[in-house]
Amino acid sequence: MAAERYNPRVAEAHWQKVWEEDRTFETDNSDSREKYYVLEMFPYPSGRIHMGHVRNYAMGDVVARYKRAKGFNVLHPMGWDAFGMPAENAAMQNKVHPKEWTYQNIATMRSQLKSMGLSLDWAREFATCDVEYYHRQQMLFIDLFEKGLVTRKTSKVNWDPVDNTVLANEQVVDGRGWRSGALVEQRELTQWFFKITDFSEELLAGLDTLDQWPEKVRLMQRNWIGKSEGLQVRFTLDGKTAPEGFSEVEVYTTRPDTLFGAAFVGISADHPLAKKLAENNASLTGFIEECHQHGTSLAALETAEKKGFDTGVKVKHPFDENWELPVYVANFVLMEYGTGAVFGCPAHDQRDLDFANKYKLKVTPVVMPKGEDAAGFSIGETAYTDDGVMINSRFLDGMTPEAAFNEVANRLEQTSLGNSPQASRKVQFRLRDWGISRQRYWGCPIPMIHCESCGVNPVPRADLPVKLPDDVEFDRPGNPLDRHATWRHVKCPKCGADARRETDTMDTFVDSSWYYARFTAPWENEPTDRKVADHWLPVDQYIGGIEHAILHLLYSRFFTRAMKVAGHVGIDEPFKGLFTQGMVVHETYKANGQWVAPADIRIEETDGKRSAALLSTGEPVEIGSIEKMSKSKKNVVDPDDIIASYGADTARWFMLSDSPPERDVIWTEAGAEGAHRFVQRVWRLVAEAAEHLKDVAPKTGTQGEALVVSKAAHKAVKAVGDDIEKLAFNRGVARLYELVNTAAASLQQVASGNADDELKSAVRDVTEKLILMLAPMMPHLAEQCLAVLGGKIAGRETLVARSAWPEFDPALVVENEIVMPVQINGKKRGDLTIARDADQASIQQAVLELDFVKAALNGSSPKKVIVVPQRIVNVVA
């Protein structure tokens, strides 16, 4: 009998309600089973989820459901990364309070995520803007302050003139603010910092332990931490050109071997020598101001045009006092890195070469490839940066650069300048302390109080939390907390005098740097329950975008170590396994120069050529490139529309099936329709056979068709489990397609009433296994299929979501037959399929019975038959 068409809208709502009432996915911390913590990066509540969210959370849900089925006590929570500038922008534009805007968005997105059927423990849900959460964050801040891991200092900062706030170096991308896109300026402000540099060596060494992280992410962090071993060299200033009070410049270099190729010394615009020289030089003052118009990070400097200002000051070469080098103020030298001064060797550093060519400085090669002729070796437009042999370097000639490094270091360490060595070996890190002060309202208040008599002190713990005031105005840019009439005024906790609160709030990356720990016991009064946190952490599988490789992931690694120092956790690394999924991309469409949404067009195909037209007018539409889904280009597909049309399981299945999870997936309507057809096919096959299978006990087949279909199912159980363990979801999907294709005829035979008892038992067993394997990916369909079969697994009534992963029989997984190529006189003519354990005589006999062998021999006997066991057969005619 034909089954009714599967209705995902009805089925999915039903099973979501069942799971909620059953509290299927709530996690008990006291459960004694082995733990497994899977976490996807929690979302910012921007208003609606997008297909990228669907892919990210579908992947995490497959892992969570699979691990539950494998017997683990799984923690799979969800929350909201809810502070940040967009809420303030919305407040200014729409006259709505950030809190109201944020919680409305959370309600919408929570409903959307629930419609996906995710196996989340919603009982642990929190938003980082919840007072209960940022109260504990303020407790952590004070703990870290008391441990010496928080400091306040004046420094050059990246100022975003549009968002009117400070940005960390990591938040400046190509010289622009990561959110606003505005060109960043340098300003000098007093800021709060986390002393992440105290952990530079630890953070670097810890990367070697993260063998379940992508190598690309580890390399990005390794480069960002930027450990270098070099030499700090004192260059004597020429007394005739140097200003009063300055006798030397200290230079940090990682290439002291190239000293004889030096063409100039570059100093930072903030170097004391530059500031002194600018006192009487208006042109230099103007150049220094120009240098302050870009970000403070190395990345910002690397992308800016290289510029310099010749100060007229000279320095003497460390090995030749008659050799003078010009001193430039250079816009690519950072005061915060090394000593704020470098020497430039144009032949062996591309930046220095570009600079030297611009200012017509001498280029002298001092390293050349082995085997080259020194007299004929020169540098063109590209610096030589590889290894080789030293040239044009006096006593270093003929050495390797490594040997030359040590020779220069040894000589200068033994040379006195004044009362100390002219050089010393130093280790430097590119990593800077994390400036967390933000001049905005919608963030976690920094719990500090400023008193003219007592200085700056923490808010007493009894007075926490410092709550954000609700009565603020967003009628102009800047921080409303600075303008609040009463909130900022407070008594000093030490002397009782009038004082003021800190009005800066914390960088929102602080909020996401410890949330994974809070999820382990979000009801605790302390930031963590140490015993519970140490049980659950580290997160076993973390899933999110590679765009967070430096910012969020590095900060979280620091925060875990800082929390360990403060006694809140006992681990070093927060995330044992990291998976970075690809993006969801879509075609772009344009009509009359304007972007057009996919929902507003129709696609047609004629003679293999695709064309598009507007639904409203039929006007032609240009089909553009495939790009990341973005609102600006309107190539966005709303998950609500997909779920309403096809169901959540279809959306999940397509997101998992179309490409390897680490690669981008191209969303297509055809792909979604194909996934939906598979959903309907599975339902139809199971539902039409259900009446004949309801009361049948599952049993593995032993012969004929029953054995064939049982073997296919057992092989799939092993393979799909292996695929999920490796996060190779698309391969698991492909195997399930294969199993359905293999089992379809048997299911149809059962449905027609023509199956014997053995086949029915085998098909019941295969169907149960299929349902259990589909469940992590299409959980609603799996529950509906089991329900139509009577709601039992192995004779016991249960939910699929509470059922174990199916077992496989190793004997049925092993291939009992092998395929051996057959050659005649050394050339392959065909194949022989034979039992794996067949002896040599049996193989020879079987080969001689093959039609193509008989034809080749033409009635004659072969001279010999050579058998390489389980590999190949060669018939010599």
UniProtKB/Swiss-Prot annotation:
> What's an example of a GO molecular-function annotation for this chain?
aminoacyl-tRNA deacylase activity
Q: Which residues bind ATP?
A: K631
**CDD domains, sorted:** Anticodon_Ia_Leu_BEm, LeuRS_core
The UniProt entry, under InterPro entries, shows: aa-tRNA-synth_I_CS, aa-tRNA-synth_Ia, Leu-tRNA-ligase, Leu_tRNA-synth_edit, M/V/L/I-tRNA-synth_anticd-bd, Methionyl/Leucyl_tRNA_Synth, Rossmann-like_a/b/a_fold, tRNAsynth_Ia_anticodon-bd
Work out whether the entry's keyword set contains DNA damage.
Answer: no
- UniProt cross-references to Pfam families, sorted A to Z: Anticodon_1, tRNA-synt_1, tRNA-synt_1_2, tRNA-synt_1g
Reaction catalysed?
Answer: tRNA(Leu) + L-leucine + ATP = L-leucyl-tRNA(Leu) + AMP + diphosphate
'KMSKS' region (motif): residue ranges:
628-632
Q: What is its main location?
A: cytoplasm
Keyword Nucleotide-binding assigned: yes
The protein's enzyme class: ligase
GO annotation, biological process: leucyl-tRNA aminoacylation
List UniProt keywords, sorted A-Z. Aminoacyl-tRNA synthetase, ATP-binding, Cytoplasm, Ligase, Nucleotide-binding, Protein biosynthesis
- Motif 'HIGH' region at which residues? 43-53
Q: Where in the cell is it found?
A: Cytoplasm
Listed PANTHER family: LEUCINE--TRNA LIGASE, MITOCHONDRIAL, LEUCYL-TRNA SYNTHETASE
Family affiliation:
Belongs to the class-I aminoacyl-tRNA synthetase family.
Query: What is this protein's name?
Result: Leucine--tRNA ligase
Please state the gene responsible for encoding this protein. Answer: leuS
